[in-house]
Amino acid sequence: MAYNYVELGSLITPSKTVRCGDGDYPVLSMTMHNGLVFQDEKFKKVIASKDTSDYKVVYRNQLVISFPIDEGVLAAQRIADAGIVSPAYGIWDIDQSKILPEFLEYALRCDRAIQYYKAKLRGSTARRRTLPTPTLLAFKVPLPCLEEQEKVIDRIHRAQSVKEKRNEQINKLDDLIRARFVEMFGDPVANEKRWGTRPLLSMGTCKNGMNFHYDDYGVEINCLGVGDFKDYSIISNTAMLPTVSLNEMPSPEYLLQDDDIVFVRSNGNKKMVGRSVAVYPGTVPTTFSGFCIRYRRYTDAVITPYLLRVLKADSMRQQMYGRGANIQNLNQQTLSSLDIPVPPKTMQEQFADFVTQVDKSKQAHKYFSKLVA
């Protein structure tokens, strides 16, 4: 259906700044995927500064814009009559006679909007790039009648419900893989089945990723970064990864190969450190960022599908932390201390076949989830 499009500036105006002072309001945090949430629910505690007097009060149905905006961190406040947010956030009043706050939120978080922000950002440092306010307000927003907006919102809600059910099925399939692994091989750290073990680095080598500069140019190449790991176990289409500009093509040691395993080496989020993914770039030249470590096998004692599950086991991740990795870093010395159980290769291959079949089911669920996204 064709809609009229109007500039965002005709729908929102800057709100009057109201500070928290000594008021008692819930602290709200912005998220990429769920908009505004109660901070104590997101982090299981309030992590805001003890002094929130300078925080901004945001009322129900006001628009909150965070940064970097190209990550979609903006939302209509729809969870409390009033809450407080970081003083760095921008707050706008929405003309509700023209547009429903929830409809506006979806319009400003859609792919077309994100691409607009990315194309218009100014500045040289990635996470400090800003979108000039006049440019933001010039963005064209679809504006059907209010009745049609309500219908669109209802369709989005129904699609989200289907997607959530699909994701539940995917999580159950992940649990099935973990259960099958434990059934066949036991816990890789406790090694109650008494498999022979080998140090991880006796079976392969590690390489830290590339550091590059935003003013480099000349060669465009796909690059695996921390933000691309998500909940993946395998990345097989590296052509879909973001590209970076380099002055020259990286040396072969910085190019990923099929069956490589890449770890998150450094991140502010402890849960991300040590996360691993197997990559299969095929013929697509692909490098990896300096916040990652690449592991490359040179022995067939273990196969990648088995080894990846060993490295993803909770007990193995905990061992990484316990042997020298602090909250934000993993290093090659820590990886060298990991002992890997080596069961018979036929068992590893049986497990790999099982994972392949389960992954086919996961891909089917993901495909249908995308259809309703």
What annotation goes with each model-predicted range?
Residues 60, 64-110, 225, 252-312, ...:
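A short beta-sheet element
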Residues 47-53, 126, 138, 250-251, ...:
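A structural connector/turn signal
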Residues 21-30, 120-121, 193-196, 213-220, ...:
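Short coil/turn segments at secondary-structure boundaries
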Residues 5-20, 30-63, 198-213, 227-261:
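Sequence-specific dsDNA recognition surfaces
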Residues 1-20, 138-154, 165-210, 337-373:
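Non-catalytic DNA-recognition/assembly elements of restriction-modification systems
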Residues 122-125, 278-280, 321-324:
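Short amphipathic beta-strand starts and helix->beta connectors
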Residues 83-90, 124-147, 211, 285-292, ...:
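A short glycine-rich beta-alpha junction/loop motif
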